Design a protein with these regions (language model features):
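Disulfide-bonded cysteine motifs in exported proteins
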Residues: 78, 143-146
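Sec-dependent bacterial lipoprotein signal peptides
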Residues: 10-12
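Short coil/linker segments at helix-helix boundaries
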Residues: 102, 130-144
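Extracytoplasmic electron-transfer domains, predominantly the class I c-type cytochrome c fold
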Residues: 33-43, 47-48, 115-119, 132, ...
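Generic anion/oxyanion-binding catalytic loop in active/binding sites
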Residues: 18, 108-109, 137, 205-208
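Post-cleavage N-terminal segment of exported redox proteins
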Residues: 2-5, 14-16, 22-130, 222-232
Length: 232
């Protein structure tokens, strides 16, 4: 999942709880901070900023797996700020999001190739990632994954434990082939899906370092390899 705050500021507090885990005790007012009676006077963005960064509900100085802090992880980047608080996007902002996503793209030095579909299958079902707080994911103890199956049906026989937030990916390779254009498209969707789906809820696996380029190649193989159970 995307390790930063959800694009929708109005839902920022809830997203922070879900994506980064609540750390510490419930929020309490600090010296000079508004009390709860003033919360209704704040905009959704002001309230989210106050509760996350000033009210003491999060240990914002706690170290994270990517080498920064919880506070840094909760800060929105330019793409997220562009998407935030808008139920509908005008063409200018859509173009801005696509441009930001396109500029973030990095490709393997040797070109885009398929990896090992069996490794991709394991990564697609692996929920180990970037949790912090009282239950920290220790990257030295276990490999991180992408948990694609949480949002997508990958194999027909695993439908009962597959998510439906995203489209079914059953027969992904059968329907698209393994040409260079297909491989490039699939890589880019995994690396930063906003380049094709502005303000999508799909995580930016590559640009945020959730999946390495090698791991992306394995998941691509799981989707595209004719021998993969995705394409049975």
């Amino acid at each position: 999942m995307d390790r930063k705050l959800s694009p929708h500021v109005g839902r920022g507090i809830l997203a922070a709880l879900c994506l980064t885990a609540l750390i510490g005790a419930p929020a309490t007012a600090q010296d000079g901070a508004p009390d709860r009676s003033q919360y209704t006077e704040m905009s959704s963005e002001e309230l989210a900023q106050h509760l996350m960064f000033k009210a003491g509900g999060f240990k914002i100085d706690m170290a994270t797996q990517e080498g920064t802090t919880v506070g840094k992880r909760l800060q929105q980047d330019a793409l997220q700020k562009t998407c935030s608080g808008r139920s509908q996007m005008d063409s200018a902002n859509v173009s801005k999001v696509i441009e930001l996503a396109r500029n973030s793209m990095e490709y393997p030095d040797g070109g885009i190739e398929l990896g090992d579909w069996k490794k991709g299958q394991a990564l697609s079902e692996n929920a180990f990632g970037f949790r912090v707080g009282h239950n920290i994911d220790d990257h030295s103890a276990k490999e991180t994954g992408g948990l694609c199956i949480n949002c997508h049906k990958m194999e027909e026989k695993k439908a009962i434990r597959s998510g439906t937030l995203g489209p079914s990916l059953v027969n992904y390779g059968n329907n698209r082939g393994t040409g260079e254009d297909t491989k490039k498209y699939t890589y880019e969707v995994l690396y930063n899906p906003h380049v094709f789906f502005p303000c999508t809820k799909m995580p930016r696996f590559g640009v945020n370092g959730v999946l390495t380029q090698e791991k992306i190649s394995h998941i691509m193989a799981y989707l595209l390899d004719p021998e993969s159970p995705v394409n049975e």
